[in-house]
Swiss-Prot record:
This is Small ribosomal subunit protein uS14A. GO terms for biological process: translation. One of its GO terms (molecular function) is structural constituent of ribosome. GO terms for cellular component: small ribosomal subunit. It comes from Nocardia farcinica (strain IFM 10152). Part of the 30S ribosomal subunit. Contacts proteins S3 and S10.
């Protein structure tokens, strides 16, 4: 079980990333385009740096939806490997069964 503060901080970051996503994409496109004048490119880079640090999607962490475990996250389920195993054994994940060969 992850600390509640870590889970809450990650949720806050998700909201900040969503809020600034369009502006970041716009600025990054300006910086990336070769036809952008050098002065505009420098202004766009400065504006991008002025955005909050948590607006970058790289700072998000994939966490288990049930208990917030940060490692062993399986995207398909949104759960950690430990939680997937437990739920699969109990039959709570439709279409998932223990393989044997």
């Amino acid at each position: 079980m992850a600390k509640k503060s870590k889970v809450a901080r990650n949720e806050q970051r998700k909201q900040i990333v969503a809020r600034y996503a369009a502006r970041r994409a716009e600025l990054k496109e300006l910086i990336r385009k070769p036809s952008t004048p050098e002065a505009d490119r420098a202004a766009a880079q400065a504006a991008l740096q002025r955005l909050p640090r948590d607006a970058s999607p790289v700072r998000l962490r994939n966490r288990d939806a049930a208990d917030g475990r940060p490692r062993g996250h399986l995207r398909k389920f949104g759960l950690s490997r430990v939680r997937v195993r437990e739920m699969a054994h109990r039959g709570e994940l439709p279409g998932v069964h223990k393989s044997s060969w």
